[in-house]
From Swiss-Prot:
It comes from Rattus norvegicus. Substrate recognition and binding subunit of the essential mitochondrial processing protease (MPP), which cleaves the mitochondrial sequence off newly imported precursors proteins. Keywords: Membrane, Mitochondrion, Mitochondrion inner membrane, Transit peptide. The keyword Phosphoprotein does not apply. Its main location: mitochondrion. This is Mitochondrial-processing peptidase subunit alpha. The keyword Metal-binding does not apply. GO terms for biological process: protein processing; protein processing involved in protein targeting to mitochondrion. One of its GO terms (cellular component) is mitochondrion.
Length: 524
């Protein structure tokens, strides 16, 4: 018993001693287990004895110059050096779906799928890929409405091989019957996938261009129509290539290469070379200049009268409203880009984290005030001689009329007072996006190639940033007012039972408040 009492007393004394011992040092110093101390300085105060850091300053000026050389045959060679072992280079051609007015629609789509197939030097696509693999390279071909781009990223040491391969792919494709038949299957599959895709954006983009430009230049279909898949053959492709794949319509662009070496390779493989389709001709040559275009509407109704095994694809209604830009003045391009950034927008649900563009007009005026809106996003489609500023909105089919009225009000407000705070925020976002994208080598390549193809020169990032900073509220009002004087373009997808007529939408855009004309029905 005495032993137990003594043990309990000793335990209590030990606990008291432990409780009395301080867990930490004094407020100014803390103690290591070894007995040493270190100063307890808050993280908001600089450490004593540490030199002040010198941060790098960003002036937006690139360290390497963009050089352009024109060969005797008219082909332009543009390059910009960049630190690193790898390079990105390719051939950009002034061709695309906008030049298919006198041809079967879908040729550019076919050529995109046929790219990097067998050529005069390479028996198959596998042989091309194996050749690129020796230099750690990858290849790709992309076509848009006004540009076709063949690109390769590879080790800079294989520059001569890559330029020779690109020249062979562009100028000497075999276009065998087997390859064309495989391309027909690939195009058919892509069209089926496009029609089953839950995202309506690609279809709406095609529809709004068709509504705005009406079978004219950029209004022509970018994808091959189903009825033309079986009609496009080698003869049709050669006829198109003969007119548009000419040296004066091409740019060989490279990033991460020496300009003199690139020019030397271009002279070796692209100067005085006879293409597979023979001498160039201009039987059906079309210029990029667009003719009389007008606004309009494009609809695709999809109702519930479908098989029970396949519910309607679009259970919401999608409206794509736009107005055509008259970009005949080069100085209008930057204000339109700032206006698009100022409108901003997005979806009602963001999987990428909160806070992106939450102060843009479409977020503040539309998504934050109307909980039933699924999406409200501004898009800017820009081309050499024209453009299109659009707003994509989606909501429940029962809210279609109200949604259209909200969007027409936002279009009218574009030409009204511009707040300086929102303008500065939009300009800062645009410059930030520009500089962030130009950190990527493939993006620099595309920027160099497209600018030289369109203007024979390149505006450097710091020049573009200066133009963006100089945009004033009067510039936004000027370009918006000029845009709204034209006829609107409307594309609609989904259940469109309550969609207002095109005439009512046009009347709303011509009014002061953007309200649709009231309609009265005796029976519902």
């Amino acid at each position: 018993m005495a032993t137990a009492v003594w043990a309990a007393a000793r335990l209590l004394r030990g606990s008291a001693a432990l409780c009395a011992r301080p867990k930490f040092g004094s407020p100014a110093h803390r103690r290591f287990s070894s007995g040493a101390t270190y100063p307890n300085i808050p993280l908001s105060s600089p450490l004593p004895g540490v030199p002040k850091p010198i941060f790098a300053t960003v002036d937006g000026q690139e360290k390497f110059e963009t050089k352009v050389t024109t060969l005797d045959n008219g082909l332009r060679v543009a390059s910009q050096n960049k630190f690193g072992q790898f390079c990105t280079l390719g051939i950009l051609i002034n061709s695309g779906s906008r030049y298919e007015a006198k041809y079967l629609s879908g040729i550019a789509h076919f050529l995109e799928k046929l790219a990097f197939s067998s050529t005069a030097r390479f028996d198959s696509k596998d042989e091309i890929l194996l050749t690129l693999e020796k230099h750690g390279g990858i290849c790709d071909c992309q076509t848009s409405r006004d540009t076709t781009m063949y690109a390769v990223s590879a080790d800079s040491k294989g520059l001569d091989t890559v330029v020779g391969l690109l020249a062979d792919v562009v100028l000497h494709p075999r276009l065998t019957d087997e390859e064309i038949e495989m391309t027909r299957m690939a195009v058919q599959f892509e069209l089926e996938d496009l029609n089953m895709r839950p995202d309506p954006e690609p279809l709406l983009t095609e529809m709004i261009h068709e509504a705005a430009f009406r079978e004219n230049t950029v209004g022509l279909h970018r994808f091959c129509p189903v009825e033309n898949i079986g009609k496009i053959d080698r003869e049709v492709l050669h006829s198109y290539l003969k007119n548009y794949y000419t040296p004066d319509r091409m740019v060989l662009a490279g990033v991460g290469v020496e300009h003199e070496h690139l020019v030397e390779c271009a002279r070796k493989y692209l100067l005085g070379v006879q293409p597979a389709w023979g001498a160039p001709g201009a039987v059906w040559m079309l210029t990029a200049q667009w003719h009389s275009t007008r606004g309009g509407s494009s609809r695709w109704r999809e109702t519930c009268q479908m098989s029970a095994l396949r519910p309607p694809r679009f259970q919401s209604s999608h409206i794509y409203g736009g107005a055509r830009e008259l970009l005949l003045l080069e100085e209008d391009f930057i204000p339109f880009a700032v206006l698009n950034m100022m409108m901003g927008g997005g979806g009602s649900f963001s999987a990428g984290g909160p806070g992106k563009g939450m102060f843009s007009r479409l977020y503040l005026n539309v998504l934050n005030r109307h909980h039933w809106m699924y999406n409200a996003t501004s898009y800017h489609h820009s081309y050499e001689d024209t453009g299109l500023l659009c707003i994509h909105a989606s909501a429940d089919p029962r809210q279609v009329r109200e949604m259209v009225e909200i969007i027409t009000k936002e279009f009218i407000l574009m030409g009204r007072t511009v707040d300086l705070v929102e303008l500065e925020r939009a300009k800062t976002q645009l410059m930030s996006m520009l500089m962030m994208n130009l950190e990527s080598r493939p993006v620099i390549f595309e920027d160099v190639g497209r600018q030289v193809l369109a203007t024979h020169s390149r505006k450097l990032p710091h020049e573009l940033c200066t133009l963006i900073r100089n945009v004033k509220p009067e510039d936004i009002k000027r370009v918006a007012s000029k845009m709204l004087r034209g006829k609107p373009a409307v594309a609609a997808l989904g259940d469109l039972t309550d969609l207002p007529t095109y005439e009512h939408i046009q009347a709303a855009l011509s009014s002061r408040d953007g309200r649709l004309p009231r309609t009265y029905r005796l029976f519902r």
